[in-house]
């Protein structure tokens, strides 16, 4: 059975994703993907995990843009979520995607070195 915080996290995820497509006009916010949302059990804090396609400078600019839009996003959450208290929002860059890319590149290196070793043995 779902906890209420998980349902709220899912609703926040959908709302922020929709706002990124339709509502936010900040030029610093580029190709952003919301990868997950965790809401505390007391519903006072929503941690929003995101990834960005681009350089480190673009990642930092996007995080600044998202942080400057927190008030607007929270206001929109208050309009659409029927809750007594609208959670505060914290944006965090999701390093798991970068970590996954790093693992994938290591596996490709291992695979290519094994193939070259097999060719040399033949």
From Swiss-Prot:
The keyword Cytoplasm applies. Keywords: Cytoplasm, Ribosome biogenesis. PROSITE patterns: RBFA. One of several proteins that assist in the late maturation steps of the functional core of the 30S ribosomal subunit. Associates with free 30S ribosomal subunits (but not with 30S subunits that are part of 70S ribosomes or polysomes). Required for efficient processing of 16S rRNA. May interact with the 5'-terminal helix region of 16S rRNA. GO terms for biological process: maturation of SSU-rRNA. Monomer. Binds 30S ribosomal subunits, but not 50S ribosomal subunits or 70S ribosomes. It is found in: Cytoplasm. InterPro entries: KH_dom-like_a/b, RbfA, RbfA_dom_sf, Ribosome-bd_factorA_CS. GO terms for cellular component: cytosol. It holds the Pfam family RBFA. NCBIfam families: PRK13815.1, rbfA. It comes from the Bacteria. It comes from Geotalea uraniireducens (strain Rf4). This is Ribosome-binding factor A. Its main location: cytoplasm. Belongs to the RbfA family. One of its GO terms (molecular function) is ribosomal small subunit binding.
